[in-house]
Amino acid sequence: MMRLTVLGATGSIGDSTLDVVRRHPDKYSVFALTANAQADKLAVLCREFRPKMAVLGSAAAADALRDQLGTEAAGIEICSGTKALEEAAAHPDCDAVMAAIVGAAGLRPTLAAVRAGKRVLLANKEALVMSGALFMDAVREHGATVLPIDSEHNAIFQCLPQQVPQFGRGVSRIVLTASGGPFRTRAVDSLADVTPDQACAHPNWVMGRKISVDSATMMNKGLEVIEAYWLFGVPVEHLEVLIHPQSVIHSMVGYDDGSVLAQLGNPDMRTPIAYGLAYPERIEAGVPLLDLVTTGALTFEAPDLRRFPCLALAFDALRAGGTAPAALNAANEVAVEAFLQRRIRFTEIAAVVGDTLARTSIVPADSLDTVFAADAQARQQAERYIATACAQLPAA
């Protein structure tokens, strides 16, 4: 019986993870569930899964959970804050950790799981984007197992040589596919008028609002390029992005002999989650087998960097190295939140990120303190740019 901690249990990945878990009560139990503020939803999950720990982002949210559960809280340690998150991730009674907290907030608990030598199901790409070599060094030092949950990286992992799932060994190219999001064919000069609801309406995937906006700008793909660089040791010149509107081929690996291996499946996150939970075995995930006749044509196109400047910015940050990816991620988090609050236009997200990268000091990312200092500096610069250079939009 695998005992699981779910970091970010009330989000989209958390939902999908627990859906797979409830299909296999003989294989998995839940040790800990965490959420930022959704005490109501976490209470429902606590009643169903009876975790040993439940962690929320604030003391007020933890109190709300206690009130919600009442006498049903017996046997559940309810706590709050960053240290409690790290404890839930590293606890000796936990075997595996689903790292599904969105953004920079997920870095410390994910690293805590790595340092405890856990099986880490990595859905929090920002942990690798921000800390890169520090993260991978910790994986090697502490003997952790990291299984990528992003559909693209999960596909790459499945297509690489299984003895050593790394670049080399006859691998010549790694191709990450992208749907192109909801604005792939929209007139570029109309993108300034995009609303948050439009940006969050992904044509293929069900995702949270932040990652949906990242998909619409293709920053999500840019962050995934950086993640692939670190996870698989791929030189940047061997990383390629292709738009594949059907979201059926999740990524591809090209080999020196001309072979290209691809992983296909319906666009449902339960597939990579089930793969990560059961690896190296396979379990039922509730996802129907792909019907290629019904799917029909599979098409591909190169990304238009005029339409998707955030993708180019991510490649720039990867090539710059050091703390540049952390600054990129921080500025993007600030910009996306401002867009969702209707403080800036959709097209200003890239402007915020580009200005921040240009004005933020880039230094070697040789410690977590350095990484978080770069994160803080970039957030401050992004907010300054928004306050002084972005259009002041009328309230919705």
Curated annotation (Swiss-Prot):
Any one GO molecular-function label of the UniProt entry: manganese ion binding
GO-annotated biological processes: isopentenyl diphosphate biosynthetic process, methylerythritol 4-phosphate pathway involved in terpenoid biosynthetic process
Reactions catalysed, as given in the entry: 2-C-methyl-D-erythritol 4-phosphate + NADP(+) = 1-deoxy-D-xylulose 5-phosphate + NADPH + H(+)
Residues the record lists as binding Mn(2+): D150, E152, E224
Superkingdom field: Bacteria
Alphabetically ordered keywords of this record: Isoprene biosynthesis, Manganese, Metal-binding, NADP, Oxidoreductase
Gene3D superfamilies given in the database record: 1.10.1740.10, NAD(P)-binding Rossmann-like Domain
UniProt cross-references to InterPro entries, sorted A to Z: DXP_reductoisomerase (IPR003821), DXP_reductoisomerase_C (IPR013644), DXP_reductoisomerase_N (IPR013512), DXPR_C (IPR026877), DXPR_C_sf (IPR036169), NAD(P)-bd_dom_sf (IPR036291)
Pathway the protein contributes to: Isoprenoid biosynthesis; isopentenyl diphosphate biosynthesis via DXP pathway; isopentenyl diphosphate from 1-deoxy-D-xylulose 5-phosphate: step 1/6
E.C. numbers: 1.1.1.267
Cofactor: Mg(2+); Mn(2+)
PANTHER family named among the record's database cross-references: 1-DEOXY-D-XYLULOSE 5-PHOSPHATE REDUCTOISOMERASE (PTHR30525), 1-DEOXY-D-XYLULOSE 5-PHOSPHATE REDUCTOISOMERASE, CHLOROPLASTIC (PTHR30525:SF0)
Family: Belongs to the DXR family.
Function as written in the Swiss-Prot or TrEMBL entry: Catalyzes the NADPH-dependent rearrangement and reduction of 1-deoxy-D-xylulose-5-phosphate (DXP) to 2-C-methyl-D-erythritol 4-phosphate (MEP).
Listed name of the protein: 1-deoxy-D-xylulose 5-phosphate reductoisomerase
Organism (species): Ralstonia pickettii (strain 12J)
